[in-house]
């Protein structure tokens, strides 16, 4: 019994020692984790202190820092962070107030705009209605990329110290989207010629950064201490001037500048394919097929639907553009908040054939035909293309081949420049391959106005949206417009270009933006 008691006590001691050991081990682990957490926090503090607050950019073929006069792409991009408009656009192209505090459409052609006069210029003076009037009046007298924005303004009246009235020569749907041009200081140009004055070397602005130096080879921007509407990480931006784009690309390749933007589909031939971060944003150049919906055959929406599904857009992009374009079906499919839900327009010859068969078309005698209104209708139409545009001719050839695979007969009309313009202006075509530079405005009257599509509901909605300011209602109406578009297929969207944003791997933050403002997220950029 004594032996058993000793053994029992011994086992208890071993168990107690084991438990104590576990407690010590757990305590040690907890202490190590706490130590590691402290070390990480200290490391993070060091990293925060080591964040680079200066970046380097480039401008090729510099002209002027006056944003109303400049025709330079890089200047127009960079001046978005120096000067501000009455209204600006968000990342999804929604209009928001900037220098304007409030606005109202008081009649078809009249607008009241209240200015936020608490905003300061970088020299410390307050923004005034006189600055806005000064800008618009000078803009109307010069050759500017923004001239079209104010073309319909016939009068600008000062209502009071913070309000102006704009009167247009006609109703312009969504005119407020035109008021996105930069506003300049009247005082800054007092006694000077607007085009040749010395202030154009470094015009003051209300934006996030200000020009502190503009020499023959570089421009330096620093934080605008009077800008109070955001916390900025970057404190200095050095902009080098280059004689040509190739020189600027080479400088980026060597790491001398941190970011470039381009829609050059051959950019990789200049900067290579590795050693930098790449982001893409939708471009503005949109190619599509315009359709004469009054044509006896093309008036049938199932024919238009079938044509759309029979076109291999991806193959065209690969063959013609080397994969450097994107498929696009609709005029707002560049990321616009009003674009609505996309339809399936992917290439499928079988689907195209099925659509025709389901709607009474019969493939007979090597052609699609249907007996309609006492006569046999045959799907056989002409596709007009501009002969001098070799790229579009190549596209048209592929489209013709695609459609013929589905049994759809097409005759290409390769028109001279004058003939092509006449076809386009007079709508004297069955179908025409064309394209547009897309607007920042969601106004679709260019495409759906003038009876281009006989749809009473669509016409009614188009009249309604001109005067809707409530976002949820506007979105509801545009959702319905897209549904009608998807069903009716009054146009056949093909593809659009895109911008490539190449950045140094040490540049951090949310770099992708949109083609309105690549610096829209600059608040959180930094170097690491």
Give residue ranges: language-model regions.
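Detector for C-terminal structural segments
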Residues: 310-340, 391-400, 424-528
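Ligand/substrate-recognition segments at binding pockets and active sites
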Residues: 362-435
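Structural transition elements
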Residues: 327-365, 388-393
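N-terminal lobe/hinge region of extracytoplasmic solute-binding protein
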Residues: 58-107, 137, 204
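Ligand-site clamp/hinge motif
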Residues: 226-269, 409-411
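Surface-exposed binding/hinge segments that line
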Residues: 104, 148-190
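Gly/Pro-rich hinge or "lid" segments in bacterial periplasmic/extracellular proteins
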Residues: 73, 94, 179-232, 236, ...
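A structural "hinge/loop" feature
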Residues: 59-79, 99-100, 125, 175-184, ...
